UniProtKB/Swiss-Prot annotation:
Cellular component aspect of the GO annotation: cytosol; glycine cleavage complex
The protein's name: Glycine cleavage system H protein
Disulfide pattern: none
Annotated Lipoyl-binding domain residues: 22-104
Assembly and interaction partners: The glycine cleavage system is composed of four proteins: P, T, L and H.
Keywords: Lipoyl
UniProt xrefs under InterPro entries: 2-oxoA_DH_lipoyl-BS, Biotin_lipoyl, GCV_H, GCV_H/Fam206, GCV_H_sub, Single_hybrid_motif
NCBIfam families associated with the record: gcvH (TIGR00527), PRK01202.1 (NF002270)
Family assignment from sequence similarity: Belongs to the GcvH family.
Domain of life: Bacteria
């Protein structure tokens, strides 16, 4: 399982790549594999105000429906509209083209570095 070191992670299996005051958010390879084939993603609306730790969307797979949680507090400034037409991208490229949304950060949540996230998932 891949855990890129250039980003932070949450205990809910989301990754956060911060560039200045903007966080790009996606789910980890671990989450994508656990979900199975993703068939639908409900993303927050552009302009939505998110609070770190609160549910902000859903990912539906052939196995289950899982909540997406906001890793940071802030305002959604962009969503990956390509996910609507190709939700399987979340499985095939979770750390690249499968990103989900971008947030203008007001406050960062409790984030893990790559080593801490790898340790968390090694026991699951």
């Amino acid at each position: 399982m891949s855990v890129p070191t250039d980003r932070s992670y949450t205990a809910e299996h989301e990754w956060v790549l911060v560039d200045g005051s903007v966080a790009t958010v996606g789910i980890t390879e671990f989450a994508a594999e656990a979900l199975g084939d993703v068939v639908f993603v409900q993303l927050p609306d552009v302009g939505a105000q998110l609070t770190a730790g609160e549910a902000c969307g859903e990912i539906e797979s052939t196995k289950s429906v899982s909540d997406l949680f906001a890793p940071v507090t802030g305002s959604v400034i962009e969503v990956n509209s390509a996910i609507d037409a190709g939700p399987e991208t979340v499985n095939s490229d979770p750390y690249g083209a499968g990103w989900l949304f971008r947030v203008e950060i007001a406050t960062a949540g409790e984030l893990l570095d790559a080593a801490a996230y790898a340790a968390l998932t090694s026991g699951e």
